[in-house]
A protein has these predicted regions:
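Soluble ligand-binding/transfer domains with enclosed cavities or grooves
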Residues: 2-9, 13-158
Length: 158
């Protein structure tokens, strides 16, 4: 099975949970769009909404807003299985990263530029079917895990 996520343009629905130490898991949902405008160059946009109620005493150490916006711009050479990207994150600012495309997963890591807190992270997208991926993400600060996201990505359009 070849990858349909990232390697093909399309729109995906993400649904899962946000986890942070000392907090109950919180529902997260959103849209992920992949565009290929030029040969070898892709755009990857994520719009995610965090669902927590005011009564839940939600005291995240990381989330200051209930929406996350991530805009990637990346380069994947012809016949290559590795790519690089830059990323604009509405809470973290400017990031850079790289990724690998393996037969059954897409794995990437990123780091926040000019960050004294040494925040970085990784994401794994494991292919379940042609139109479904299991998504796992972790943000670290120094040697500590700050938060994780675990979700299912389902293709909604090509």
């Amino acid at each position: 099975m070849t990858h349909s996520f990232l390697l093909e343009p399309g729109q995906w629905h993400l649904k899962g949970v946000w986890c942070e130490s000392n907090l109950q898991p919180i529902s997260i949902e959103g849209i992920v769009s992949i565009l290929w405008n030029q040969p070898n160059w892709f755009s990857w946009n994520k719009q995610l909404k965090i669902f927590h109620s005011e009564e839940s005493n939600f005291k995240s150490h990381y989330l200051f807003e209930s929406e996350l916006t991530l805009t990637y711009r990346g380069y994947l050479g012809l016949q290559q299985s590795q790519y690089t990207f830059v990323l604009k994150h509405n809470l973290l600012g400017d990031l850079e990263g790289n990724g690998w495309i393996t037969p059954s997963a897409i794995i990437q890591r990123y780091w926040v530029l000019n960050d004294r807190k040494r925040r970085q992270g990784f994401e794994t997208l494991s292919q379940e079917t042609e139109n479904t991926y299991h998504f796992c993400s972790c943000l670290t600060q120094g040697h500590q895990m700050i938060n994780t996201i675990e979700a299912i990505l389902t293709r909604t359009s090509s």
